[in-house]
Amino acid sequence: GSEPNRARRFYHSGETGDLALAIHRITLERPNMPLAIAGVSLGGNILLKYLGEQRNNARTMITAAAAVSVPFDLAQGSDYINRGFSKLYQKYFLDSLKRKAIEKQSRYPDLPEPARINAISSLRSFDDTVTAPVHGFADAIDYYARSSSIRYLHEITVDTLLLNAVDDPFLPPEVLGEVSRIAKCNPHLTIDFPQRGGHAGFVGGRNPFRPYYYLERRVGDFLSEKFAAADRSHTKP
């Protein structure tokens, strides 16, 4: 949400602790309830990283998952968003991060001062200056290497949909090729990489007054299918 936490830490693309805690609480309170999880953008990266980290336990708690518009490779994504038309998205995203960092610095004066934060002009620079040191990474390169979900995909044991558009301004298309190769070796991964859809958009249809929302339907259909399959397996004599 938009409300900042009160801790010195922010959130980041590899922070799976909050998700793990939420899933643990849900499964304790509703142990027999089927559970599906969907994550979008940064949340999708966190979800996939969690599923890979918890490969031995995740499938006992989660029926299915869906990750949308995921920045699978954070290093390549940070370079890509700093080029061409994608820089417009970087500015919007970066301005939001800088506002949050300055607000956080008012609570924790040891964090980088506002003037230094305001001088940041790229996402990679922000991660070098703020994200990495605040969260215990050596630098942005270390943060990207340890937090990118692409390195965890082969470990996933929960049936998971990966929905990304080829024209996503946050990720170079060649990364999706690498993800596709990994998915071919993991039967739990289903990829859907349409040419168009932008970043978490996927709006289509010929009539602008009656748009077709592909994202919601695709994710809903996938999760419903997995729930139905799980229900059938549980009711077999």
Which functions belong to the PLM regions below?
Residues 9-30:
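Alpha/beta-hydrolase active-site loop
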Residues 30-134:
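Alpha/beta-hydrolase-fold enzymes
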Residues 129-152:
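Active-site nucleophile elbow and catalytic-triad environment of alpha/beta-hydrolase enzymes
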Residues 172-189, 194:
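Conserved loop-alpha-helix segment in the C-terminal half of the alpha/beta-hydrolase fold
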